[in-house]
Swiss-Prot record:
Region spans: Fe-S binding site B: 283-297
Motif Cx2C motif 1 in this chain: 283-286
Species classification: Eukaryota, Fungi, Dikarya, Ascomycota, Pezizomycotina
Record InterPro entries: Anamorsin, CIAPIN1, Dre2_N
Protein's name according to its UniProt entry: Fe-S cluster assembly protein dre2
Requisite cofactors: [2Fe-2S] cluster; [4Fe-4S] cluster
Function comment: Component of the cytosolic iron-sulfur (Fe-S) protein assembly (CIA) machinery required for the maturation of extramitochondrial Fe-S proteins. Part of an electron transfer chain functioning in an early step of cytosolic Fe-S biogenesis, facilitating the de novo assembly of a [4Fe-4S] cluster on the scaffold complex cfd1-nbp35. Electrons are transferred to dre2 from NADPH via the FAD- and FMN-containing protein tah18.
Positions of [2Fe-2S] cluster binding: 222, 233, 236, 238
Binding, [4Fe-4S] cluster: 283, 286, 294, 297
Region Disordered, residue ranges: 141-166
Subcellular location(s) of the protein: Cytoplasm; Mitochondrion intermembrane space
Originating gene: dre2
Entry similarity comment: Belongs to the anamorsin family.
Length: 320
């Protein structure tokens, strides 16, 4: 395949036809193409894929690559590299100091720096998928998927018996038969089953009765201080919180039981009618209170009331 060369020119060089023609004379015009960088950057022109063995970026009218660095972005650079053959080179114009494109972009595009500002596109073969042939599993294994095809489609190496080899040397014979593979699979399956059985632990056998009946050891921070009620930690794990809850439940149940025992029915209430004249103190100040009542007043201990007011006794409490 003939070598093709691509010259990439910045727009400022086209304004100097004499300098551009002088540059073109140093290349074979039959195997050289010229393309403007600004047209590639704007998407007005495109390059063929894997066509050129050499790509040269020309300097601008000021004999520098400042204009090329502005025009060659990542998208444009990838398009340029796509037109370069594998094993081809890309570099800036000779005898011009400076960098024609970004070094990092060249590395990211897969180029290799070979020195003197030249970058090589490595000749890497395309990746191909390699099929892997798997051995046929044992048919008696439960749940093992069977491979399609007969044994002829998946041949195994011939079996080599133990003992002396064809040369007469007493060496260990290599066995590659299907029987040997099946034995290995069966042994591995049995080992896995035994290992899984050994891992099972009965939780009821972890603690015996003596350990369950042992007293709870409280941490120092959970121990009650003198004169204060014990308080459980927020994340208590020593059993103090559960014990305090049980004590509170017992106290609440006792209080409810006592409250039910103290309840009186309507028949248990005693009514006192003060409109009926009964015992009257000699002082006549029975309704004023104990401060005004005499020593033998029948209303001692009762609060002050209005004359003729009805007084009820409920749970040993006076209700007016």
């Amino acid at each position: 395949m003939a070598k093709q060369t691509l010259l990439l020119s910045p727009p400022s060089l086209s304004s100097q036809p004499g300098k551009l023609n002088e540059t073109l004379q140093s290349y074979n015009r039959n195997a050289t193409d010229l393309q403007m960088l600004d047209r590639l950057a704007l998407g007005l022109a495109s390059l063929p894929d894997s066509t050129y063995s050499t790509i040269v970026i020309l300097a601008g009218g000021d004999n520098s690559f400042s204009e090329s660095l502005k025009l060659i972005n990542r998208q444009t650079f990838n398009q340029i590299i796509g037109s370069l053959r594998r094993g081809g080179y890309i570099y800036g114009q000779d005898a011009v100091s400076g960098v024609a494109f970004d070094h990092n972009e060249a590395i990211l595009a897969g180029l290799i720096h070979v020195g003197n500002g030249k970058y090589l596109k490595p000749d890497i073969e395309e990746m191909q998928a390699v099929p892997l042939r798997l051995g046929r599993k044992n048919d008696h294994l439960a749940g093992a998927p069977s491979l399609e095809g007969s044994a002829a489609e998946h041949p195994f190496p011939p079996e080599v018996s133990e003992g002396k080899t064809a040369s007469g040397d007493n060496r260990v014979a290599v066995v590659g038969s299907q029987k040997f593979r099946e034995n290995i699979v069966s042994a591995a399956t049995m080992d896995n089953n035994e290992a899984s059985d050994d891992e099972l632990i009965n939780e009821d056998n972890l603690l015996d009765d003596s350990e369950l009946s042992a007293p709870i050891i409280q941490p120092p921070e959970c121990r009650p201080k003198a004169g204060k009620r014990r308080r459980a930690c927020k994340d208590c794990t020593c059993g103090l919180a559960q014990k305090l809850q049980e004590e509170d439940a017992v106290k609440r149940a006792d209080a409810d039981e006592q409250l039910d025992a103290m309840k009186l029915l309507h028949d248990d209430l005693a009514e006192v009618d003060f409109t009926v004249r009964g015992k009257v103190g000699s002082c006549g100040n029975c309704s004023l209170g104990d401060a005004f009542r005499c020593e033998g007043c029948p209303f001692i201990g009762l609060p002050a009331f209005q004359p003729g007011e009805e007084v009820r006794l409920l749970n040993n409490d006076v209700q007016l």
